[in-house]
């Protein structure tokens, strides 16, 4: 009768210790994270500003391969006939304008109006039956505080229509070019073991949160501790977070050189 050979307990302990040591040396999120992020834009454009500026910009964009044009005006309503693409217009009342918020990036701009009941109205769903807009052309000249960005995300373009006449053609051309798929390097990697943001449920270092101009870094509350997360679609590689990080937990990663075929 065959007997099962019992392994010495010391072998089990050594093997377990070795496996644990290897596991700790591997940073799974870093190793499995792709080097690039991809934006997908179908060309649904939101234009925001005074009626005269928005109408002029929309007419210049008509017939240039965009999927739709949505006009949000802040003074009077407009009625712009559709040509090759659908055109939708909506007048933001003086009450609605402070409630407008825009968040996201190229191919994924969520535009909402705060409601009295606490729910937010998704304007893309209400106006064009989509979840998001792909591109935003902001012609408000800062009159509306729709987002907290110091550095706007890809796909969000600003233009003072009356004062920047010389730049109109270039900005409008940029809008038409933001249709399709676009790759951008993932500029960072985070070692959570080194991060001093939270320990034992207490929030510690917040330097990276304070310095990011793209508002790409957030503190995410876990079951016990908080952790730092960087949105790769908002990060634009400024690198202020890596300079501010006292522990080296955030490392700037240069784009990989393409191999010659």
Q: Where in the sequence are the language-model features?
A:
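A generic structural signal for short
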Residues: 197, 229-230
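Iron-sulfur cluster-binding cysteine motifs and their immediate structural context
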Residues: 62, 149, 203-228, 236, ...
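Ferredoxin-type iron-sulfur electron-transfer modules and their immediate structural context
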Residues: 1-218, 261
């Amino acid at each position: 009768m065959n007997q099962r050979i019992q392994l010495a307990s010391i072998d089990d302990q050594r093997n377990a210790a070795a496996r644990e040591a290897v596991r700790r040396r591997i940073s799974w999120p870093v190793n499995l994270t792709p080097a690039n992020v991809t934006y997908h834009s179908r060309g649904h454009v939101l234009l925001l500003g005074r009626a005269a500026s928005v109408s002029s910009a929309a007419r210049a964009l008509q017939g240039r391969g965009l999927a739709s044009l949505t006009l949000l005006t802040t003074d009077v309503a407009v009625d712009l006939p559709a040509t090759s693409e659908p055109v939708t217009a909506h007048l933001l009342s003086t009450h609605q304008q402070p409630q407008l918020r825009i968040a996201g990036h190229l191919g994924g701009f969520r535009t909402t109006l705060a409601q009295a009941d606490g729910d937010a109205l998704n304007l893309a769903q209400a106006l064009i039956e989509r979840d998001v807009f792909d591109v935003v052309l902001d012609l408000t000249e800062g009159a509306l505080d729709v987002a907290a960005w110091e550095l706007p995300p890809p796909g969000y373009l600003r233009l003072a229509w009356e004062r920047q006449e010389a730049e109109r053609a270039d900005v409008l051309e940029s809008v038409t070019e933001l249709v399709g798929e676009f790759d951008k390097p993932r500029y960072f990697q985070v070692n959570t073991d080194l991060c001093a943001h939270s320990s034992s449920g207490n929030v510690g270092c917040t330097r990276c949160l304070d310095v990011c101009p793209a508002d790409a870094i957030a503190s995410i509350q876990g079951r016990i501790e908080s952790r730092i997360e960087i949105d790769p679609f908002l990060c634009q590689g400024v690198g202020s977070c890596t300079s501010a990080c006292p522990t080296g937990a955030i490392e700037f990663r240069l784009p990989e050189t393409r191999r010659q075929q």
